[in-house]
Amino acid sequence: MCIRDRYVRQPLVANQVQFSIPVSNLVANGMEVNMETPGSVDHDGSLLDYCRLHDITLQAWSPFQMPSWKGCFLGSDEYPELNQKIRVLAEKYGVSDTTIAAAWILRHPANMQLVTGTASEKRLKEIIAACNITLTREEWYELYLAAGHPLP
């Protein structure tokens, strides 16, 4: 980002990054500090911290995507524990699984935005409903762990 600062005079106001519950490398290196895990390696130059310090809005694209472009994780057999926890929270809040997955991203203190890329009115309404849900920290971390991410 320092190179960009040197040569580009326009302020950077947003940065689009891939981010979902299973694809959460953006937060992994900050949480897996001093662990010998792939997530503990700084792959992005601390992009999350840089954007927060410089008031750059992070926009999460593919918010329902699994790693390696395997499709949507919602309802996938590859994430049974995650989907079960999402269903429990969806029932608790009276919303859809999509709403909970979107609320997980919106709950992060970086005040991220979602890039939905949907043409479905139903899905868009479910995503918008996430603005009215504030997951607890415990719920946020339960979903993070259920996706298979480690914590120290």
Please provide the spans of the model-predicted regions.
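Beta/alpha (TIM)-barrel catalytic core signal, keyed to glycine-rich beta->alpha loops juxtaposed to Asp/Glu
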Residues: 4-152
